[in-house]
Amino acid sequence: MRILQLPALRDNYIYLLHDPETATAAVVDPTVAEPVLDKLAELGAELVAIFNTHHHHDHVGGNLQLLARYPRAVVYGSQADRGRIPGQTVELQAGETVAFAGRQAKVLFVPGHTRGHVAYYFPESGDLFCGDTLFAGGCGRLFEGTPEQMLGSLDQLRQLPEATRVWCAHEYTLNNLKFALTVDGDNPDLQARYQQVVALRQAGSPTVPSTIGEERRTNPFLRWDQPALRAATGAQDPVRVFARLRGMKDQF
């Protein structure tokens, strides 16, 4: 399974999963249809699945146009997003699996950013498509969920193997790390990562994917149990630490 990263709009990433052996493809969170259609034509591949992480328009905006061209494609999304994902044909629950290219992806229920957010984790290849729950160096805003829900979702992702590649849906890394330095500035891993990200962005290169290990070492939203983050927030309870961090980031 090849993973092709397609930039869209200002800072979105669409992910096209390609199986050369069967000339089929699946897409994760098609912001818009055009770059997906162009790449499918270039590859000579048929779209067989759309994996949506949540209902926001910049993640489902291309669904219907893709279905017009590939009407047999199956559209996956959370059961909690029923009626909110265009063209949805399969309603997923936590613990279910979906398949592509002979590989099984676990459906992880990760509410917080939205009430129905899911992530798709391919354990065999070590790839996580987490939408707007976990970002490189950050996490999604809480539009529909609670701090308790988001903390539980991030803790679930934090426990995945360190080598897991994190394919998040936005290029927010540089700003996320600028904020991280204000609350965890003495962290040498964070300092080094910031310099690497600055160089990547100056070169016009993506900073995604990262890894779970890298996020555990440098992402403040996965480090709520570290003394530096407790000190920065003036809290000890994990939910309070997280909630205060999220509030600080919202104002950053």
From Swiss-Prot:
| Annotated gene | gloB
**Which pathway does UniProt place it in?**
Secondary metabolite metabolism; methylglyoxal degradation; (R)-lactate from methylglyoxal: step 2/2
Under what name is this protein listed? Hydroxyacylglutathione hydrolase
Q: What does this protein do?
A: Thiolesterase that catalyzes the hydrolysis of S-D-lactoyl-glutathione to form glutathione and D-lactic acid.
Record flagged with keyword Hydrolase: yes
Q: Which organism is it from?
A: Synechococcus sp. (strain JA-3-3Ab) (Cyanobacteria bacterium Yellowstone A-Prime)
The record's catalysed reaction(s) read: an S-(2-hydroxyacyl)glutathione + H2O = a 2-hydroxy carboxylate + glutathione + H(+)
Key words, A-Z: Hydrolase, Metal-binding, Zinc
Q: Fetch the CDD domains from UniProt.
A: hydroxyacylglutathione_hydrolase_MBL-fold
EC identifiers of the protein: 3.1.2.6
